[in-house]
Amino acid sequence: VLVNKIVQFTKENNLDGVDVDLEWSHVTTGYSEFVLELKEKLSANSLGMTAAFPSETKYSLITTEALNAFDFINIMAYDYTGSWNPSAPGQHSSLNHAQRGLNYWKNTIGVPGERLTLGVPFYGYDFQNSTTVKSFTYASMVASDNSNADRDNVGNQYYNGRPTIRSKVKLAAENLSGIMIWELGQDSFTEYSLLETIHKKYTDYNVETTDLCGN
């Protein structure tokens, strides 16, 4: 019943497919069976299916068959630190983190690069003190000072600015199928937009982006 409702919702809203973003404790013994049933119904309706997975973790309960059912696997190469680890201030999504995630899924797990996308964050973490960490949007950093668009941190506020995003696009363009974003609503809808930065960098590589990016 759930699978049929998901497919119906996807079709009624003219979506391209479904992203299965069940994480950690939500990945239970029924996960793989659910994924395979969903894949069958989506494929019958010419719809795609992707999954978002941690940067360097493959859940043990996911079978090889279920893993291979995804059209794309989105590598969540962020949240290496955050509100759950207030005593460890620092960058939660560095270029090195992205390289590690790429290496894990492509080389250790063996997923072909054409089925992988690199997740980038449009948000950051403010390590206010040893017990308090709050998230913030990239848009808020740019709104406070336009020059923050080209930084990765201001004091104990860590995020991804345009130079790091460009480097990650280069990494993805050379090794993977594309970029995944969490999430668009956190972008600065100005000339400092990270989405526009991604679009321009891909254009440099003669890669056509979607209408969402203006190409």
Where are these regions (language model features)?
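Short, acidic/polar
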Residues: 1-12, 55-64, 159-173
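Glycan-recognition patch characteristic of GH18 chitinases/ENGases
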Residues: 1-10, 89-91, 95-96, 103, ...
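Glycan-binding loop/region signatures in secreted carbohydrate-active enzymes
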Residues: 113-175, 196-215
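Substrate-binding surface in catalytic domains of secreted glycosidases
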Residues: 24-146
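Active-site groove signature of glycoside hydrolases
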Residues: 3-30, 75-79, 180
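Soluble or luminal CAZymes and related metallo-dependent hydrolases
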Residues: 2, 30, 93-100, 157-164, ...
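Active-site and adjacent substrate-binding regions of carbohydrate-active enzymes
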Residues: 21-48, 53, 163-214
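A structural motif
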Residues: 15, 70, 113, 176-177
